[in-house]
From Swiss-Prot:
Keyword annotations from UniProtKB, A to Z: ATP synthesis, Cell inner membrane, Cell membrane, CF(0), Hydrogen ion transport, Ion transport, Membrane, Transmembrane, Transmembrane helix, Transport
Example of a GO MF term: proton-transporting ATPase activity, rotational mechanism
Gene that this sequence comes from: atpF
Segments forming a coiled coil: none
Membrane topology designation: Single-pass membrane protein
Protein name as it appears in the record: ATP synthase subunit b
Lineage, opening ranks: Bacteria, Pseudomonadati, Pseudomonadota, Gammaproteobacteria, Pasteurellales
Family: Belongs to the ATPase B chain family.
Listed transmembrane segments: 7-27
Entry GO terms, CC: plasma membrane; proton-transporting ATP synthase complex
Function: F(1)F(0) ATP synthase produces ATP from ADP in the presence of a proton or sodium gradient. F-type ATPases consist of two structural domains, F(1) containing the extramembraneous catalytic core and F(0) containing the membrane proton channel, linked together by a central stalk and a peripheral stalk. During catalysis, ATP synthesis in the catalytic domain of F(1) is coupled via a rotary mechanism of the central stalk subunits to proton translocation. Component of the F(0) channel, it forms part of the peripheral stalk, linking F(1) to F(0).
Amino acid sequence: MNLNATLIGQLIAFALFVAFCMKFVWPPLIKAIEERQANIANALASAEKAKQEQADSKAAADQEILKAKEEAQKIIDLATKRRNEILETVQAEAEIERQRIIEQGHAEVESERKRVQEELRQKVAALAVAGAEKIVGCSVDQAANNDIIDKLVAEL
């Protein structure tokens, strides 16, 4: 048994095996590995892109929330301003109405005072005429009575 011939035979068999593997086995394995690497790279890129999109979306959402808060504050400020304007208007109208009612009350009081004063003058005049009739002892006719009362009222 020649060790060299066996070694050469094994070397040839191994070389054929390597050539066979290089030709038929290795390319599909490399292809599968490259596909897997591409899939992993795509998945990582997609994950990174999704992460960036999520960050952008969060920033946009935060911006929208900030805008909404500002808009809500503007609406609240406008409503407060409008409320104050309405309150001022209502208070001014109430003050005008109060003044009108007070003036009307004063006018009514003055009118009532004049009416009572006139009534009192007529009663005083009637009493004066009645007293004068008792003193004189005779009654004057009604027309003369009215003339005397009118003159007394005018003097009072």
